[in-house]
Regions:
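N-terminal secretory signal peptides
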Residues: 1-29, 38-41
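N-terminal cap/lid segment of alpha/beta-hydrolase-fold proteins
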Residues: 66-104
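Short beta-strand element of the alpha/beta-hydrolase
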Residues: 108-117
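Short amphipathic alpha-helix adjacent to the substrate-entry channel of hydrolases
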Residues: 123-147
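Gly/Ser-rich "nucleophile elbow"/oxyanion-hole loop immediately N-terminal to the catalytic nucleophile
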Residues: 155-197, 307-310
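Primarily recognizes the serine-hydrolase "nucleophile elbow" in alpha/beta-hydrolase
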Residues: 178-236
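Short beta-strand/loop motif that positions the catalytic acidic residue
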Residues: 241-243
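C-terminal catalytic histidine-bearing segment of alpha/beta-hydrolase fold enzymes
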Residues: 267-311
């Protein structure tokens, strides 16, 4: 699949065979994606590949279930590869809160700014920062409720949603950009290789950061509302847009956005997962879709590898 095209993911297993057969998917990406499929014998038979010869090369997207006892030692070793914890930094005279995960190796490493959903910086997003750190990225999740006391100051998610609605979008975008600058200032981050990803509300924020912050090197908005189309001409960031096939509200804005991106010759790729709904990546929510989440995670890692890790 070339950049500046959009695709619908067809049942995932069938799509993998089609993509590798037509040269749209590298063998490395094919093997990594095949490793997450359960019951993928049809793919193995079609490609003449032995399933036992395939080992997952990337972190699984699902952490909803506890690890089996047999993997406890491996999990401990994996966690020893990263350091994680809360951070604070200044922006416009205010203290912003966040959670940062990074590889223990000295680096410098590429960085990723993560923007949470519209319910605050909940544990799921802390986990995503750790997953990315295990892949080699210094990852900062900014608490976009910092100006209201922080996520931990709210008793329930309804109050978090209400508080976020009370913060101007431009302010939230600027707080995201402040997080990018904080990452760039860290000695273990390569300031020239910083990207952003976000989910739901955070996906929309990442789109707005992408059209306004030329220092970003890659962006991955998950089911985020489209930016103002007039701003698309300002985009200097390669964007991977992840969408859910059953997400009618967000998908209504995709055709116009896609047309604007193509007209401006921008680097982008859109992937949609039929049968998945808005927020399908969140493994703590009722709409979690394990297969779509796993595939979207590998798409994300491939995008960041191409535009952050290998650049």
């Amino acid at each position: 699949m070339k950049d500046n095209e959009s695709i619908r993911s067809p049942g995932i297993a069938t799509g993998l065979v089609t993509d590798i057969g037509t040269g749209n998917l590298s063998r490395r990406a094919f093997l990594a994606r095949l490793a997450i499929l359960a019951g993928g014998s049809a793919v193995v038979m079609a490609c003449g590949t032995q399933a036992t010869a395939i080992a997952p090369s990337r972190t699984s997207a699902s952490t909803a279930k506890p690890r089996p006892a047999a993997t406890t030692e491996a999990a401990a070793s994996e966690e020893a590869m990263i350091e994680s914890g809360p951070v604070e930094f200044e922006a416009d005279g205010r203290t912003l809160l966040g959670y940062l995960s990074r590889p223990v190796l000295p680096g410098p490493h590429p960085g990723v700014l993560l923007v949470h959903e519209n319910r605050g910086l909940l544990p799921h997003f802390l986990d995503v920062t750790r997953r990315l750190a295990r892949e080699g990225y210094v990852t900062l999740a900014v608490d976009m409720l910092s100006r209201k006391g922080g996520t931990d100051s709210f008793a329930d998610t309804g109050a978090m949603l209400s508080a976020l609605r009370g913060i101007p979008t431009d302010q939230i975008v600027e707080d995201g950009n402040a997080g990018v600058r904080y990452l760039q200032d860290q000695p273990y981050v390569d300031r020239s290789r910083v990207g952003a990803m976000g989910f739901c509300f955070g996906g929309g924020i990442v789109w707005r950061m992408a059209v306004g912050n030329p220092e970003l090197r890659a962006a991955v908005p998950f089911y985020g509302s489209a930016p103002t189309l007039e701003d698309v001409s300002n985009l200097q960031v390669p964007v991977l847009g992840i969408y859910a096939g059953a997400d009618a509200r967000i998908n209504a804005g995709v055709p116009g956005l896609e047309s604007a991106l193509k007209a401006e010759g921008k680097i982008f790729r859109f992937v949609s997962y039929p049968g998945a709904n808005h927020a399908f990546f969140n493994d703590t929510g009722s709409r979690y879709h394990p297969q779509a989440a796993g595939e979207a995670w590998l798409e994300t890692l491939e995008w960041f590898e191409d535009h952050l890790m290998d650049s």
